[in-house]
Curated annotation (Swiss-Prot):
<dbReference type="InterPro" id="IPR033747">
    <property type="entry name" value="PurE_ClassI"/>
</dbReference>
<keyword id="KW-0547">Nucleotide-binding</keyword>
<dbReference type="InterPro" id="IPR011054">
    <property type="entry name" value="Rudment_hybrid_motif"/>
</dbReference>
<dbReference type="InterPro" id="IPR003135">
    <property type="entry name" value="ATP-grasp_carboxylate-amine"/>
</dbReference>
<feature type="binding site">
    <location>
        <begin position="138"/>
        <end position="193"/>
    </location>
    <ligand>
        <name>ATP</name>
    </ligand>
</feature>
<protein>
    <recommendedName>
        <fullName>Phosphoribosylaminoimidazole carboxylase</fullName>
        <ecNumber>4.1.1.21</ecNumber>
    </recommendedName>
</protein>
<dbReference type="InterPro" id="IPR054350">
    <property type="entry name" value="PurT/PurK_preATP-grasp"/>
</dbReference>
<dbReference type="GO" id="GO:0005524">
    <property type="term" value="F:ATP binding"/>
</dbReference>
<dbReference type="GO" id="GO:0004638">
    <property type="term" value="F:phosphoribosylaminoimidazole carboxylase activity"/>
</dbReference>
<keyword id="KW-0067">ATP-binding</keyword>
<comment type="pathway">
    <text>Purine metabolism; IMP biosynthesis via de novo pathway; 5-amino-1-(5-phospho-D-ribosyl)imidazole-4-carboxylate from 5-amino-1-(5-phospho-D-ribosyl)imidazole (carboxylase route): step 1/1.</text>
</comment>
<feature type="domain" description="ATP-grasp">
    <location>
        <begin position="110"/>
        <end position="298"/>
    </location>
</feature>
<dbReference type="GO" id="GO:0046872">
    <property type="term" value="F:metal ion binding"/>
</dbReference>
<dbReference type="InterPro" id="IPR005875">
    <property type="entry name" value="PurK"/>
</dbReference>
<dbReference type="Pfam" id="PF02222">
    <property type="entry name" value="ATP-grasp"/>
</dbReference>
<dbReference type="Pfam" id="PF22660">
    <property type="entry name" value="RS_preATP-grasp-like"/>
</dbReference>
<keyword id="KW-0456">Lyase</keyword>
Amino acid sequence: MDSKTVGILGGGQLGRMIVEAAHRLNIKTVILDAAKSPAKQINALDDHVDGSFTNYDSIVKLAEKADVLTVEIEHVDVDALIKVQEKFPKVEIYPLPETIRLIQDKYLQKNHLIKHDVAVTESVAVETNTVDDLLHIGEKFGYPYMLKSRTLAYDGRGNFVVKDKSYCEKALEFLKDRPLYAEKWCPFTKELAVMVVRSLEGEVFAYPTVETIHENNICHLVYAPARIPDTLAKKASILAKNAVKSFLGCGIFGVEMFLLENNELLINEIAPRPHNSGHYTIDACVTSQFEAHVRAVTGLPMPKGFTEFSTSITNAIMLNVLGDKATPNKELEICRRALETPHASVYLYGKTTRPERKMGHINVVTSSMQDAESRLSYILGDTTEIPKSLATDKESPLVGIIMGSDSDLPVMAVGARILKQFGVPFELTIVSAHRTPHRMSEYAIEAPKRGLKCIIAGAGGAAHLPGMVAAMTPLPVIGVPVKGSTLDGVDSLHSIVQMPRGIPVATVAINNSTNAALLAIRILGAYDSKWLTEMNQYMLNMETEVLGKAETLEEIGYEDYLTDKLKK
């Protein structure tokens, strides 16, 4: 695909997955790291360099073999990179050494972002690493506050919570002689992340906003998309893109942020490389974060939409596989359960097991977060058997049929049969707007998260159910007026059809759940073309049926036709 050879400083799991992406594009890669590192295990070339990515001579050897240098870890020797750039002016280095230096020092990183009007957590440099220094910071920020190493820190290593004055000495003992800075305590409600890829021209593309769950300061789970309102997800995406725009050079960047209780977003830190929070992209997105990085540093095309989810209904959970604390290789039991689970993919890194070491990850990709969570539950061993719905790979419902009373069931069952005829997964239940208002509210709000794409709501009399549900969900709602005992359903029809502006409800004829189901299938066609194909076939069948009747009528005459019809 490209004649450039990419030299990678670092041969860990991130380098390994960069190599995999580059191989698919016929791009040669050479690795600088220890012999038999994870990236070298899957690239059997003799050109690799055994050595340290912080050693000038080793970096020179790598530069002699490459057209482009990039990093899988930011803890490289930037001064050495700059010297190499001077020695080999034709060798491109991405991200630029200046960018790597800025991001390496987390305090400089924050000051850089502040200068570019990017919201970050409040912080201050620690000048002399003394107890008095930390006490003064405590007076400024209050307790607790976070003391952090400015450099060589990741996965919580280099962080210490200063809970009160008595912890100041302990903090200095723990962090020793590192350069330090302090952050004001940030009472976040969620941790979010956005992968952003930057082209050499400065154009940025954001992957979906995700939610990260940490245990012992190590990323444990990633939910994609994040379990937050779409407006907040978009806000996070804009913040991440603005942050990455402020740096020079190209490549993929991992942007971590905090979501506060007041819905304010603050950047926590940025990594100038592929990131753990982006591993889900391998299976869930059009292009993985690793391929995006390769494209960026080699100047390959990055078309609009290449960082989006593969489908509009994609939901994914990434699980980190860590070395077991007690029993070596016990973590492989999780991997085995994942291999038994439909829609789960296992990625192992070729590492020797150590407690809490990142040994691999598992991606679970389905059409709803509820489905993904069910599969994850089995993988983690929370359930001992694969749920029947997973064993049979039963599809999650796409359409919800609800009614105010079981007396509406004879009407709504007709629509259910239509959905069943088409093979559309659906659910059917009773939700009363007046008798179970809390249940109705919960059903409407949670419906999108459960993977529903459309709701059919049948109601008679006052018929408030369709409108109330439509007011609480962004999904399309189809109202079915049910014929009552007094006004023949006209009251229900008028109630459903007369919705105020801004709260649309598609309303079908009285008792006509058939059309409601058919309309729901057409709506599904906007998500998946197979439903358009099914609907087109249904319409052709109707045409064939009517043409057949017309032919018979014309052949035998209306009197015999009517006699035969009455007999039936």
